[in-house]
Design a protein with these regions (language model features):
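Membrane-helix interface segments
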Residues: 12, 99-108, 137-142, 183, ...
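Hydrophobic positions within alpha-helical transmembrane segments of bacterial inner-membrane proteins
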Residues: 29, 79, 83-91, 95, ...
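Membrane-interfacial helix termini and adjacent extracytoplasmic/periplasmic loops
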Residues: 3-4, 42, 51, 104, ...
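A structural signal for multi-pass alpha-helical bundles of membrane permease subunits
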Residues: 26-41, 74, 124-136, 204-210, ...
């Protein structure tokens, strides 16, 4: 009844619901990480701390199992390729769309947002048919997986960079142009430094999405050499998985968290000095 009397107030049960959600989301991950360091093959009973499944076991550990190593390397390869292509292309598209005011600009903006709302299974099937029937000379494998991941990660870069463009406004560009700076100097010495926080953040998001992706990557996979960590975990989960899979997932998780942490500190550094950067660029 108190909530009905004041519907705009914060419900008292909201902190409890939030805590339960966080607990439900985090606990399974913590348990999976914990059993990656279990000395036994058991996934239910703890028998002591060990690095056996990372490098100690000479046949089943991540360090000694070629299949686990190959999945991790291929996952990181796809993530690096996706970031290297999606981020520059997304920044270019964001700059172009932000300045395009002609006919059809609204339709293009809607098309750029479609990958964000399209179910992954629909996108995966569509891309599979595309590579099998139209671009069959490319075939399935690393190239198809990279193109597939770029297809849905590109929109994230465009949205984040355009948001940054809207927030900084056109004033810095106009001031640089008024001071006689040529267009390439305005772009590389004024605009891109101001966009660097959004570019870094979008790169981190694309990296995490690439490592996490399963559906599109699974549909576009070729032979065993194009297996990723998520695909390997899914294929092994229904069998008799060893804690080495927990170790593999833990490594992938810490790589992602380490990347996000690094980007966060770099972002703080850029964001903290963005005004000084812009002023210095204008003075030059």
């Amino acid at each position: 009844m108190a909530w009905l009397r004041n519907p705009w107030g914060r419900p008292r049960f909201l902190p409890l619901v939030t805590a339960l959600y966080i607990f439900w989301s985090v606990v399974p991950v913590v348990i999976a990480i914990l059993f990656a360091f279990n000395d036994s093959r058991s996934r239910t009973s703890w028998e002591g701390f060990s690095m056996r499944w990372f490098y100690g076991d000479e046949t089943l550990s991540v360090w000694h199992d070629p299949a686990l190593q190959g999945a991790l390397k291929h996952t990181l390869l796809l993530a690096v390729l996706c970031v290297a292509i999606s981020v520059p292309l997304g920044v270019t598209l964001a700059l172009g769309l932000q300045r395009w005011r002609g006919r059809g600009s609204g339709s293009i903006n809607v098309l750029m947002l479609l990958p964000l709302v399209t179910p992954e299974i629909v996108m995966g099937v569509a891309l599979l048919l595309l590579f099998l029937q139209i671009f069959n000379q490319i075939g399935l494998g690393t190239t198809a997986q990279t193109i597939g991941q770029i297809t849905f990660t590109l929109s994230y870069v465009v949205v984040m960079v355009r948001g940054r463009l809207v927030s900084i406004g056109p004033e810095y560009e106009e001031a640089a142009a008024d001071l006689g700076a040529p267009p390439h100097d305005v772009l590389f010495r004024v605009l891109l430094p101001l966009l660097s926080p959004a570019i870094l953040a979008s790169a981190a998001v694309v990296f995490a999405l690439s490592i996490d992706d399963f559906v599109v990557t699974q549909y576009l996979a070729g032979d065993a050499d194009t297996t990723t960590v998520s695909m390997l975990l899914y294929a092994s989960a229904r069998g008799a998985p060893t804690p080495a899979l927990n170790a593999l997932a833990t490594i992938a998780l810490f790589i992602t968290l380490g990347t996000l942490t690094l980007v966060y500190f770099v972002y703080r550094r850029f964001a903290g000095g963005e005004d000084a950067t812009a002023v210095a660029a204008l003075e030059v």
